[in-house]
């Protein structure tokens, strides 16, 4: 692919999430989040018993980290304001002003170094107490407490920050925690899962509404989705139908209400058919239609390939795989450490779908990166890791983002996951994603 010039208005940055980089320093009793709850109840399943207590210690190193980002030529940095840290009491609505000053200084450092702050308001860091009282996002009360939190954050920072995102990958902790049972709270409860999905979508309308007074300041609000393109094994009708259902349950469940203002009718029919339909109030659908997001972030790592089921789905509880089976394409390019396929052209497919099916809403690649286990094997005699594999991965995806922009898709940036090695759920630091290596012994 030919070299491409990066447009002046195209953001290049890195992404992070609070619980994966900050650690728990500065947090007070009662400010535990989902991540601490996950680790504290099941430390033995986390790689090397490493959890979110320290993470990569951004809390103490943010000034030097941000300065180094800028020295790399970055023009943006996406981070999370951690709900559990920001609120001293998330139920009573009491703000922790120590946290306010910490985040204010982070924003100041980003702008001082010539970068655009991009803020996610929730990256799985729901306060732990809301799990104990309301079953997390399954409880409707959580929607209103989230709204209370969002209003408090916007009141503090609307003048300094213009690019806001209500959620990052809202589906992942729900699917892993309530559908597949591999993350906290380790359930196989599809009805609860779809209730939680619905409540996150409803909560987004509250955030959109809360943002309205600040639109005149140039503020915009979006959502960052783990939007994984779905590809059928073949053009046969049964494989095409399998891909249709995988896309319906994994992509359109969020994309359609966020961008079209309504759920796909086929999705609602299937939820009713499988006794998984969520509870709602009629006014909820009116709000979903009225209060839509301004932009979209796309977290893309790998495609999903599916085929028609060859054996009947025989589990006791519903799962979307009732309608399809995963398919591994022979001869694919893939990351052997994670088992994830590498398919850069999917970025073009994503961009053209947004252009053609979703009114060409502004969007950017909000996460893209490659996790490698045992990177020490690539260390050279000077002590640096020769990560040409990472350079090739990032270059290929960035080139596609620029390509699809040139095709008329409204792509405004590309953000790498991540700047420095960060903690992941269960895998901890097993797979390294950073542009910079983190020495766990020295920090």
What residue spans do the PLM features occupy?
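Active-site region of glycoside hydrolase catalytic domains
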Residues: 2-46, 70, 90-91, 100-443
